[in-house]
Amino acid sequence: MSEDFRPRSDFLQTLLLRGYVHQCSDLEGIDAKAQSGELVAYIGFDCTAPSLHVGSLVQIMMLRWLQKTGGKPIALMGGGTTQVGDPSGKDESRKILSLETIEANKAGIASVFSKFIAFGDGKTQALMVDNAEWLTALKYVDFLRDVGRHFSVNRMMAMDSVKLRLERDQELSFLEFNYMCLQAYDFVELNRRYGCVLQMGGSDQWGNIVTGLDLGRRLGAPQLYALTSPLLTTASGAKMGKTAQGAVWLNEDMLPVFDYWQFWRNCEDRDVGRFLKLFTELPLDETVRLESLGGAEINEAKKILATEATSMAHGREAALLAEEAARQTFEEGALAESLPSIDIDAAEIEAGLGVLAAFVKAGLVASTSEARRQIKGGGLRVNDAPVADERAALQQGDVASGVIKLSLGRKRHVLLKLV
């Protein structure tokens, strides 16, 4: 991307200034389309779980900003591609899901989007479509003859998603090898049906997306464009959206609103400014002001981040209730005054303290083997959330007002106080 490029469209100005852009095939072309008011763009979401988590939130926000700046977003549900499995970023083959599971997952994922974008038949109203509509209707021989002949196996083998698996001598099934062909075909089909000219996604999808551009050119489609967002990690390098309790889900039935609010409140100081730009709609000058706060004042910025981000996912009322619950729990000292505590070096949490070791250190269990038994029985909790994975580690995202609450059963609790 050219550093001299100055976008004229509100869409690209917003994405560039707020940090959403990693790679782009043609900034000038996308800018012109956005200025014309004719930009239709999509992002695909495979149905591998009953909810999306905050790792997908950057992409959802890109669709939201597209709509707010006059474009038309398409949320593509991968009812067809999920049956194959995307090998991108994976060390082993994905588990094959039943059609019933895929449908149930699709319903859970679809419920997220109405919180962020408006659906309907209007020019800028969003569409939700499922690639199973066309992929499951394809005839194999016809697809090979009409579409497959345009793919170069040489180029496919050079894709990171393929090359890394082969270099590590890890199996890559023929099923997964075909995934990029289906994703490329999705782009062409969405162009034919809805005039979609831009595919967006995470940086790990760049190879798949530009394959779609190439296929469109070979099949005579109009000019198509690609744009990806950066891989999102915390300032300490941890994968975005992971805590000791697991993924930070967007659906309330999989993660309480209070825990969602706490996730944002507990972000690292160095992440506050970046997250305010990406996950809220606060004016940029306000995000800069909040980012510049130091000392204890940075906690006020984190509360604003938490409430704004939670408002989008769960509504303003629920966000304010979560904020008040946190105030009563942590700031009025309800926990600190009544529970035993031990001091722990903040560097241990920064490095990722194993949850088994943490419970031993807190004196709640005598050994890691006892901790494992308690986890199997649902007896260990971190910040009142059950620990399901014995390999989990406590991280900065688990810290609330300088403490982490560990519980054995319902009656034994210890606070880890960071020093």
From Swiss-Prot:
Motif ('HIGH' region): 47-56
Gene Ontology biological process terms in this record: tyrosyl-tRNA aminoacylation
A Pfam family hit: tRNA-synt_1b
Catalysis: reaction(s): tRNA(Tyr) + L-tyrosine + ATP = L-tyrosyl-tRNA(Tyr) + AMP + diphosphate + H(+)
SUPFAM superfamilies assigned: Alpha-L RNA-binding motif, Nucleotidylyl transferase
Presence of keyword Nucleotide-binding: yes
GO CC annotations on file: cytosol
Predominant localisation class: cytoplasm
Entry binding sites for ATP: K242
Keywords: Aminoacyl-tRNA synthetase, ATP-binding, Cytoplasm, Ligase, Nucleotide-binding, Protein biosynthesis, RNA-binding
Enzyme class (EC, first level): ligase
Residue window of motif 'KMSKS' region: 239-243
Protein name: Tyrosine--tRNA ligase
GN (gene name): tyrS
